Curated annotation (Swiss-Prot):
Pfam family, one: DAP_epimerase
Official protein name in the record: O-ureido-serine racemase
pH profile: Optimum pH is 7.9.
Regulation: Inhibited by thiol-inactivating reagents such as iodoacetamide and Hg(2+) ions.
Gene that this polypeptide is encoded by: dcsC
UniProt source species: Streptomyces lavendulae
Annotated function: Involved in the biosynthesis of the antibiotic D-cycloserine (DCS), a cyclic structural analog of D-alanine, used as an antitubercular agent. Catalyzes the stereoinversion of O-ureido-L-serine to O-ureido-D-serine.
Family label: Belongs to the diaminopimelate epimerase family.
Amino acid sequence: MIRMRTPSTLPFTKMHGAGNDFVVLDLRDGPDPSPELCRALADRHKGVGCDLVLGIREPRSARAVAAFDIWTADGSRSAQCGNGARCVAAWAVRAGLARGPRFALDSPSGTHEVDVLDADTFRVALAVPRFAPESIPLFGHDGEQDLYEADLGDGTRVRFAAVSMGNPHAVIEVDDTATAPVARVGRAVQASGLFLPTVNVGFARVESRDRVHLRVHEYGAGETLACGSGACAAAAVLMRRGRVDRNVSVVLPGGELRISWPDDAADVLMTGPAAFVYEGTFLHASV
């Protein structure tokens, strides 16, 4: 007699923010998903398909209505996700956890104030940008610089800015984002050893004082349609260098985010959409 193993069931919600897509799990009464399960969920052919997995947790701070943890498509953990924060905010509103127009969420990188602007638009205070190499962390460079240079080992030299938005970012200014070598250079910077354990690599073009185009090669996921923390990182770098105003639109392949940074000591504010796609049940032996 052949015994068929009955798979466990895992309810989930599929969401996206400007095309950056997520599998959202309610983990308030459950364990962390294993790296294997995260990879299975993220698989676009054999799973649900997503850039990252978001796990809803009970709040960790007194003023938060919920907390969330983040896993990339390769099963590794992440400390920050701007688009994910907006989606968790929308999830919290729908679940009845957040009842007013302003509330807070806890992420692995800290506590974030959220403003509900309409049914599917949220503003999140992401973080105060940190530029000191040791706070990113960036290795092999002594002292803080506006731009760093690195030899990527294949004859390619790049100039980049570096910043932490709760997670590490390298920002490279380019003439044309459409033709920028996002995958090749993004992977090379990630493998360079300059950032440990790794880094998100953004390729930015300034169109005007209030408009920036951006593509981002994320660690653990590759290029995504949008990266909220990457948009904040690019905007903060360009604002600090005087290239753009303190309130800009960042245009990504999947949509547009509004980024503002009132002053150097303030959190960067990110405004953008959060969308529910569908709800379902995932069947997997390792759940």
